[in-house]
Amino acid sequence: MKQSAALVLAGVLSISAVYAREPADSSKVSIELHTIAATDQVPFWLENNRLGQVNDDLPFQQMMMLNWEETVSDPGKRFVIDYGAVLGTRLGRVSSLFAEQYWGRISKGDFYLLAGAKGEPVWENGLSHTNGDFFLSNNARPNPRIELGAEGFRPFRRNWFRRLSVDGRYAEYLLLDDRFVNHANLHHKKVMFHFQLSKAVTFYTGLDHWVFWGGISPSSQIGRLPGFKYYLRYVLGKSGGEESPETDQDNIAGNQLGQNLFGLDVRTQQYRVKFYYQHLFEDGSGFLFHNMQDGFWGVSFRLLKARPLIQGLVVEFMNTTNQSGPYHQYAPDPAKPDSLIGEGRDNYFNHGVYHSGFVSYNRMIGSPYFVPEIKRGISTGFQSTRIRGLNGAVDGYLSDRIYWSAKAAYSRYYGQYEAPYPRFKELFSAETTIQVSMRHQPVSWRLKLATDLGDYLDR
């Protein structure tokens, strides 16, 4: 059993200043200083969901992050413009300077247009291991994108239909990181329908769809992949054309994957509860729920009382072991080679053409339980895609100025159907945080203790 422990020595020193030029306008600048010291390698909870800031191969590292954000509105208050950047430097055995985020956004009413690289808003104080989204956490450094979206749009204003609101986004990513297929693109669209069942209860359902498309493969059998010419085939989930690889012609164009979304929100004056279920698919069998056992389930609870000892709780479970079954186009009877069974072995987040998998800057875009294999500085996909994981987290306040949280996760890794582990590998991870805010200064100190136990992350 591997054991790894780490202590964040200086934690996070955060200095921020906010000033307003008009009621709707503001500028915010903050500086964060981090020092991480580990006995072996950086533990799971300190490394993940940090937008790729932490280098897990450096037991000792220091970082400085500069955060800048500006909000302005036009004189008529018709548009609101946000823009900002997060720049970082890392000092250690390997030092680096990087631009983590850089973005601009213009909003009008319920609609917005965003351009640049920007992380997702932190949900439930970071207690969720996926930031509440199985496919889009804050685990990886974001690539730049152009995104058109809506938040809380109400298409109907009368009768029962006024209870319906819609969230959506349509985005195209420019993949600037090094990967097996260079100059590839990533398409993303998501729509969520919210139905207010009562004053306190809202049900939602939606669809989340991702596609890797285009690019140049180093494989001589594939080479340059069709680009914008086949754009509608990619975004509509159609089969490839005559210029596509044979596998795309037989199936669908590009690397297509996504999830069906379901949830229930309950909000009272005293508390808020959310139940959520996210069901992943990689092909038609998954979309039709042939892999019903697989998915991501969670519940979050938060007291709305100001600064109680225990304020929030999140419990989540993930399973990806079914993958629509162990057979894919398998002939059980050698005498009947055309009698094939099975549409399984989905091998989530890996792909035969886009070998780097569902990653951004060599980190899983979604659930950090999935850890890519890195060879010569490039992700070659995920060695284990059949995983079960359970995690829980809690937070609250010891006083008005002292915040605390605790997290724990246990996961089992079974490899792939094509390459199963002789015995499952496992990982237990835990972290606790204490943050103290200065009484009269915009400064806070954060101390984190974290540990890993298990054999999965041995290097």
Labelled PLM ranges:
Residues 21-28, 70-82, 94, 107-110, ...:
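Short loop/turn motifs that connect adjacent beta-strands in outer-membrane beta-barrel proteins
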Residues 1-26:
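Bacterial Sec-dependent N-terminal signal peptides
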Residues 56-60, 93-96, 138-142, 183-185, ...:
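Short sequence motifs at beta-strands and strand-loop junctions characteristic
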Residues 248-459:
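Outer-membrane beta-barrel pore domains
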Residues 64-72, 99-117, 144-151, 189-196, ...:
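Feature captures outer-membrane beta-barrel proteins of Gram-negative bacteria and organelles
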Residues 80-177, 195-213:
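Outer membrane beta-barrel
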Residues 21-64, 74-85, 166-168, 447:
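Transmembrane beta-strand segments of Gram-negative outer membrane beta-barrel proteins
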Residues 33-41, 70-72, 87-91, 108-110, ...:
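Transmembrane beta-strands of outer-membrane beta-barrel pores
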